[in-house]
Regions:
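Conserved ankyrin/ankyrin-like repeat signature
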Residues: 20, 57-58, 90-91, 124, ...
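Intrinsically disordered, low-complexity regulatory segments in ankyrin-centric signaling systems
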Residues: 1-28, 33, 37, 41-44, ...
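A generic tandem-repeat structural signature
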Residues: 66-118
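Ankyrin-repeat boundary/"N-cap" motif
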Residues: 3-9, 35-46, 72-78, 105-113, ...
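Ankyrin repeat A-helix N-terminal signature
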Residues: 11-16, 49-55, 82-88, 115-121, ...
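Ankyrin repeat domain, specifically the short helix-to-loop turn at the C-terminus of the second helix
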Residues: 25-31, 60-68, 94-101, 127-134, ...
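Ankyrin-repeat-protein effector appendages
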Residues: 2-8, 108, 199, 240, ...
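Solenoidal tandem-repeat scaffolds enriched in leucines and small polar residues
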Residues: 102, 110-124, 131-132, 140-144, ...
Length: 276
């Protein structure tokens, strides 16, 4: 069977033609495992593709035929996340409420704790902790701890739940960008920054990932590199003792980064606090 033949399942899925999908699977049951050849579609499986397109009927059929429910290759995310990010609520509900037990490696909850925390699904986060207290240390596929994404996305209640359960406030993301939860929050999440600082996050911690473009950055420098121009975070960090003279691995201060990027709001705060 050639590549063109294996790819026929994808347009059938996208159009919602269940008869065609069923016929193709009867001819070759292994089609549930093929990958899309177009890199712009992230080499998705048919189930990831169906979830992203909101085709609930196709999702059901593919799962019935043995599709892997919690597919998580190194260049993409599981079907439930494709559905969530494309705002297909009924498909998300199917994965999380009807077949969560089919999602391997998720404590029978349908999604890993890291991604539940990323989405703000606090009840699922709580259930993970109840079923596996060590899940607060689980790593996502980019090396993130469960604290990284809720810190980035300003989900303060989830941050508190994780910290109360023993999550490491100084955990480094180890596979992609680097940085601790405070670095991630410092991009644009003032409420998360406030909670992390109140809970003891080191305000002058460093991004330790040597091959990251953010290597050596403190949370303040990280804040000064982001297009959000979030001066509220700048104030919080400085008031907590952030070193405005600190430089990153390239020898640049927060002020230097703001000038390069035209971040006038952050620059104004830095200058008001004596940056030069």
């Amino acid at each position: 069977m050639g590549i063109a033949t294996t790819q026929a399942i994808f347009p059938a899925v996208e159009s919602g033609d269940l008869d065609a999908v069923r016929r193709l699977l009867e001819e070759d049951p292994g089609l549930v495992y093929v990958r899309h050849t177009d890199p712009d579609v992230h080499h998705w499986t048919p189930l990831q593709f169906a979830a992203a397109k909101g085709q609930l009927g196709a999702c059901r059929l593919l799962v019935e035929r043995g599709a892997e429910v919690y597919t998580n290759p190194m260049n993409s995310y599981a079907p439930v996340m494709q559905a969530a990010w494309n705002k297909h609520a009924e498909v998300v509900k199917y994965f999380l409420e009807e077949i969560p037990d089919k999602a391997a490696g998720t404590n029978g909850l349908g999604v890993a704790i890291n991604l539940a925390a990323r989405q703000g699904w606090i009840e699922i986060v709580r259930k993970h902790i109840d079923r596996d207290p060590l899940s607060v240390h689980q790593r996502g596929w980019i090396g993130d701890s469960p604290l990284h994404w809720p810190s980035h996305n300003n989900y303060t209640e989830i941050i508190s739940v994780l910290l109360d359960a023993g999550a490491d406030i100084e955990a480094d993301e180890i596979n992609c960008y680097g940085g601790k939860p405070l670095h991630w929050a410092s991009e644009h999440a003032p409420a998360a920054v406030r909670v992390l600082l109140d809970r003891g996050a080191a305000v002058n911690s460093r991004n330790l990932k040597a091959d990251s473009e953010f290597c050596g950055m403190t949370p303040l420098i990280m804040n000064a590199t982001q297009k959000n121009d979030c001066a509220e975070v700048t104030e919080l960090l400085i008031n907590a003792g952030a070193d405005i003279t600190a430089v990153d691995a390239k020898g640049k201060t927060a002020l230097a980064h703001t000038r390069e990027r035209g971040l006038t709001r952050i620059q104004e705060v830095l200058l008001a606090h004596g940056a030069a």
